[in-house]
Amino acid sequence: MTGAETSVQLYSVREAIAEDLPGAIARVAELGFTRVEPWGFVDKVEQFRQALTENDLSAPSAHAGLVAAEDVQPIFAAAAALGVQTLIDPMVPAERWSSRADIQATADRLAELAGPAADHGLTIGYHNHRWELAQQVDGRPALEVFADLLDDRVVLEVDTYWAAVGGVSVPELLARLGERVQLLHVKDGPITDDPKAQLPAGEGAMDIPAVLAAAPRALRVVEFDAYAGDIFEGLAASLAYLRGHA
């Protein structure tokens, strides 16, 4: 990967997708994105596949619940059908990050899935929220303990905004995690836990140039958990900012 690669997490436009999946994805492509990160695709895989094909979009990564899934095979098959390369679990609840034993259990589960995922051409990853950084185990952020316990085949997608909300220096975190970090969620805002306060990249308190410089080879994935303005305008502004910081 090169640092110039930019994608968008489709959770950002979930309301538009719920109303008109083909139309929403076409609008994302019209903004200038060529890559997307699907979410909620397993039971709509053919609709997503057709929309991606019609708009010349690729999906190098996607989100799906893996750790708690009873049967991962349909998830793997759906991801492979969309050409996904890295399949990322978007969240393990906060209560599962308070002890080393719980963290080990999550790491073990992802390691268990890495082999079967590889049979589908997939790499397994994990995406953080704030609690993996805010909660400490053995005097260190839980996410860093987790990284030490991960199988070498498992990668990280660091949500840079939620990491900052969790109280860490994101550039320093990325430096410590190193090549394990293959993807970044890029977002901006006042660095609070209110999703509706999020802003387009470059308009908030995040030092995004320093963040990008700390992981120059990671795929940049634009995301809004929520946005008070027009979400498509927010995505366009973020993409323009990132193109200016290639």
Model-found features: residue ranges?
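Residue-level recognition of beta-strand->loop/alpha-helix junctions
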Residues: 12, 39-40, 63, 128
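Short, surface-exposed connector motifs at secondary-structure boundaries
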Residues: 28-35, 56-59, 153-156
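A short beta-strand-loop structural module common to alpha/beta enzyme folds
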Residues: 34-42
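Conserved beta-strand positions in the central sheet of alpha/beta enzyme cores
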Residues: 7, 37, 61-63, 88, ...
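Active-site acidic/histidine proton-transfer and metal-coordination neighborhood
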Residues: 35, 67-155, 160-163, 176, ...
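Histidine-acidic metal/acid-base catalytic patches
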Residues: 1-30, 42-45, 80-84, 120, ...
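Short acidic, glycine/proline-enriched helix-loop-strand junctions
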Residues: 46-64, 106, 122
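Short active-site-proximal "capping" loops at secondary-structure junctions
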Residues: 41-45, 59, 65-69, 227
